[in-house]
Amino acid sequence: MADKIKSSYKFSKSFYDDAITQGKWWSKLYFKLLWGGVDDNEIVRRVLSWIPDDFKGKMLDVPVGTAVFTTEKYKRMKQADITCLDYSQDMLEQAEYRFRGAGITNIKTMQGDVGALPFEENTFDNVLCMNGLHVFPNKDKAYSEILRTLKSGGELLACFYIAGEQRVADWLAKTIMTRMGWFTPPFDTANDVRKRLEPYYEILDFHVEGAMLYFRAKKR
């Protein structure tokens, strides 16, 4: 499964940004079918707005992807200590290229697995996880590792596909997206995610739009 994920993102690196930013006509159709017409760009803006530009702590961005959504935000976060991790080396190289072009110097990048984060407990003040939790093969381990490395009082900020909201989206996720290696079952519903979060976090924001969930939760 891990090799399939790597190869799928290697294959898609030439059109990945157009797909997720709705830069082409076909990507607009993709979002209408998969996400129920939700504007992923707007949801990303809302999630990133939860992080102040003058944030001074340590933040983990996993998976960073190509940093197509985050580069402009990170240019403004000059006082933050940011670590960007991705399982796909191809995605990571594109993110690094963007960061260099933007002159960002307060970011460390590394290839790694969210299910085995190479960090001590209570390392990060914030963890940002955009478009990742529908991809990670071992979701239990991903949540566990994020919880372990997040400080008490730190925030987990996330957005991702959830099951049970849109029939067409669920069909596409289970068939085409899974077959291509871009999504990995099983997929949580909104209620599943609440059950994961509530024992360990105070849920500050929790929103479902189309087949996408985005939330902000503070570790107890």
Residue ranges and their predicted role:
Residues M1-D53, V68, E72, K174-M177:
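Conserved class I S-adenosyl-L-methionine
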Residues R216-R220:
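C-terminal lobe and adjacent flexible extensions of AdoMet/dcAdoMet transferase-like proteins
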Residues D140-S152:
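A short glycine-rich, Lys/Arg-flanked "PGG" loop and its adjoining helix->strand segment in the class I
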Residues N126-N138:
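A short SAM/SAH-binding and catalytic strip from SAM-dependent methyltransferases
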